[in-house]
Every structure is written in C-alpha cells, then in structure tokens.
UniProtKB/Swiss-Prot annotation:
SUPFAM superfamilies documented for this protein: alpha/beta knot
Protein name, entry field: tRNA (cytidine(56)-2'-O)-methyltransferase
Catalytically driven reaction(s): cytidine(56) in tRNA + S-adenosyl-L-methionine = 2'-O-methylcytidine(56) in tRNA + S-adenosyl-L-homocysteine + H(+)
Uppermost EC category: transferase
Cell location: Cytoplasm
Organism whose genome encodes this protein: Methanosarcina acetivorans (strain ATCC 35395 / DSM 2834 / JCM 12185 / C2A)
C-alpha cells in the first residue's frame, strides 16, 4: 500500500487559512495519510481534525513542524519527496516514477518556498508550468498517481456518510457505539 503525506510550507495564518485547509481536505480525500504543517496554526489543526471526526478516516495533522527535519527523516526511512510548483519537470514525465513510490511526501508551498526545497526534493514537478492553486496541484498529482479509486474510498468511523444521488443531498448519520 502506498503511503502519502503532504508537507505544507509557507502557510501564513492570517492569509492562507482557507487554502491550507482545502489543501489538507483534498489530500485527505485523495488518499494521503496526513499533513505536516510547517507553521503554527491551531485553527487549521482543529478544522481538519473536526472533518476527520465527522467524516471518518485516519488522517492526521502535525502542526509547526521543521520542514528540513521532516524531509530528512522521511528520506532516511526510504521515502521520496515530490515538490509541486509551476517550475520543474512536467508532471506527465514523472507520473510513472511517482506511481512506483511506496512512500511519498508531496510538498506544496504558499509563499515563495525556501531555495533548499529544490535540492531536498527527489523531484521538482511542474503542474502545468503556469500559475495555479496549490489545491489544484495536489488534486491533479494525487489523482494521476492514485492506486485504486480514491473517489470511491470509504472512510471508516464516519459520523456522516453521503449517499450518491442524481439530485438533492442525501446524508446518513451513522450510529457510533
């Protein structure tokens, strides 16, 4: 089974809370096991933990991490690092290699990322070679490298479950014991 974790760099609490939350939500939905936040923002932690509590799964978030230490530890444990931006090799050119990774850290920045990220990453990947959203970069990349069908994944322990329907909103409240 593939392990994917997301590392979020450069989060600015007053400016980026919504986009960082959406990056985490997208990573969770598409199969990441957790998010490492290289900033201190308890609001993001609480928002994502609340989603996991209500909608299920085992997604975790670590707040205020040292990105260099996290990357080094990940690589020492045999993991690979993929930095997503609008610079680097084109995503279609490395999709096959990324699919083979059993342990992958996906790095996305908010503001200008520290230059050493380009050296620490195994791949610097351009998602479209045009300005874009971090949410889009994570979604496109994770969809391209997905094992199975993450859009059909069930999240264990959910309090709420959406029932697919052609029209309307159908939500089941699950009983927990």
């Amino acid at each position: 089974m593939k392990r994917i974790v997301l590392l979020r760099l450069g989060h600015r609490p007053e400016r980026d809370k919504r986009i960082t939350t959406h990056v985490g939500l997208t990573a969770r939905m598409l199969g990441a096991e957790g998010m490492l936040l290289a900033s201190d923002d308890q609001g993001i932690v609480h928002s994502l933990e609340d989603v996991v509590r209500r909608w299920g799964g085992d997604f975790y978030i670590k707040n205020n991490v040292n990105f260099k230490q996290e990357i080094r530890a990940w690589k020492e444990e045999g993991g690979k690092v993929c930095h997503l931006s609008m610079y680097g090799v084109n995503l279609p050119d490395v999709t096959g290699e990324l699919k083979k990774c059993k342990k992958l850290m996906i790095v996305v920045g908010a503001e200008k990322v520290p230059p050493e990220i380009y050296q620490l990453a195994n791949w610097n990947v351009a998602v479209g070679s045009q300005p874009h959203s971090e949410v889009a970069a994570v979604a496109i990349t994770m969809d391209r490298i997905a094992e199975g069908e993450p859009l059909e994944k069930e999240f264990p322990g959910a309090e709420l479950t959406i029932v697919p329907a052609e029209r309307g909103k159908h939500v089941i409240e699950n009983i927990r014991e």
